[in-house]
Amino acid sequence: MKQYFIILGSVFVLLSNFAASGQKKITNETDEQKRQRMAWWTNDRFGMFIHWGLYALPARHEWVKNRERLTNEQYQVYFDQFNPDLYNPVLWAKQAKEAGMKYAVLTSKHHEGFCLFDSKYTDYKATKTQVKRDLVKEFVEAFRAEGLEVG
């Protein structure tokens, strides 16, 4: 049994070395360039991450379709009902700035594929719901108007 674990451990170490050596650097960024690029995080670390979309309608969790094994037909009701009449990114941006935030990130498309923005690649998007607007565009414009970074 001891020999089995030694062999298994050796195989694991060998394979992990191959995995590490197979990683490719995707940029030619120097350490100094990375430090400069990430300096904003040190200076502007207070921000807002908004995780919001079609999955908000069932009011349980963002993985509702997957975890509750909803069919496309069952989930369609949320697409049909989607009309965020209280969506007010101008107010959100003003409040974020007043709170001292420096940036905001919006989940523009979640795992189920619903887009809060207009896209030529799908009809599964906010512009095809009752709201008929590009919600990401409104978000970006509102936050930039307040001088906040957007992601």
State where each predicted segment sits.
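Bacterial Sec-dependent N-terminal signal peptides
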Residues: M1-K24
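Mature catalytic domains of secreted/periplasmic carbohydrate-active enzymes
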Residues: G22-G151
